[in-house]
Amino acid sequence: MTSPWSAFPVQIPQPSIRGLSQITKSLFISNGVAANNKLLLSSNQITTVINVSVEVANTFYEDIQYVQVPVVDAPVARLSNFFDSVADRIHSVEMQKGRTLLHCAAGVSRSAALCLAYLMKYHAMSLVDAHTWTKSCRPIIRPNSGFWEQLIHYELQLFGKNTMQMMDSPMGRIPDIYEKETRLMIPL
């Protein structure tokens, strides 16, 4: 396992919500539109695109490898079935000096959840730390509640403890890291 910060950029790049958001030296997140933009892919030296959606079609470019992860953005979807295989693929691409773009339709829920799983597995980051880092790079991330439950379970599997938990709110089950902002919107 590499140290938690060894693959991170020396300076945190400016967060982007329309283009590609750089998470580590070799991992980016985006939405489906940006993922099909050849100029963005080539200027960021992307060698592998992982499409975590059923609704976004790939535009295949010959110099890029593509992986399809057909998962809908619904709390009942079993994204956790792909935590290890996607994390392993991202790590493999990095070891070959490549760069991975992980995307879903909006770059908010599915791709973010898989990014968090990767950071936990290969950078030994807690779920809270992985979320804090990823949100600093891409402020719009917000995995759905079902993905959070799966990530919390995955953190327990990896480390034998949890750094966050789900809680009840007027908006339904939410991770406790959202308690403060939820309280500001709706008194709990």
UniProtKB/Swiss-Prot annotation:
Keyword terms: Cytoplasm, Hydrolase, Membrane, Mitochondrion, Mitochondrion inner membrane, Nucleus, Protein phosphatase
GO biological process, one term: protein targeting to membrane
Xref: Gene3D superfamilies: Protein tyrosine phosphatase superfamily
Membrane topology note: Peripheral membrane protein
Subcellular location(s) per record: Cytoplasm; Nucleus; Mitochondrion inner membrane
Ranges of residues in domain Tyrosine-protein phosphatase: 19-160
Any single GO CC term annotated in Swiss-Prot or TrEMBL for this entry: nucleoplasm
Keyword Mitochondrion among UniProt keywords: yes
Entry annotation: catalytic residues: 104
Name the record gives this protein: Dual specificity protein phosphatase 18
Source organism: Mus musculus (Mouse)
